[in-house]
Amino acid sequence: MSQTIACELVVRASPERAFAAFTEVREVLKWLADGAVIGQREGGRWGLGWYSDPEGTSGYNIVGVFGEFEPPLGFVVRDLTFTTPEDEELGPMTLTIGFEAVSPEETRIAVVQQGVGEEPAWDAYRAGLGISWARSLEDLRAWLEEGRPLPGR
């Protein structure tokens, strides 16, 4: 069995701008990840990485393949796998992110991550996932609405 994590946020930005924040490397590096590889097309890779030590020698990464890529409506990343610094892999999962204009200046961003395991190996990942997405979406809001990147970016 598996679980689904979902959250959403309305931001003052167009769907095009919000979509770009998730799919353009230079944007992702400002608010979400320490490293990114993004092939902007169906079948392209979507991969993000975060350092877990000050030297930047090890870390976490999440990698999958765009099963759908429909600017500015949304995208689906399939075969998503999370890897720890100890090389433990969790997956596969599916990540769906949608963008809907709710006014001329606002967009609803909906994040749905499916396939989150219930086995003990998933406990720490599952416990932090909803909180991590909520915090990341607030970081996205700060970037899109205020131009404020994460510290050190």
Each model region followed by its residue ranges:
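A short, structured loop/turn motif at beta-sheet edges
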Residues: 15-16, 39, 67-74, 98-108
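Terminal, regulation- and interaction-focused segments at domain boundaries
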Residues: 1-15
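Hydrophobic pocket/interface hotspot
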Residues: 18-19, 28, 46-48, 66, ...
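Short beta-edge strand/loop motif at the mouth of beta-sheet-based domains
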Residues: 6, 26-61, 151-153
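Amphipathic alpha-helical segments
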Residues: 12-31
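Beta-strand/loop substructures that line and gate deep hydrophobic ligand-binding cavities in soluble
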Residues: 84-134, 152
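Short, highly charged C-terminal tails/helix-capping segments
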Residues: 142-153
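Hydrophobic/aromatic beta-strand elements that line small-molecule binding cavities or substrate pockets
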Residues: 7-9, 61-68, 93-101
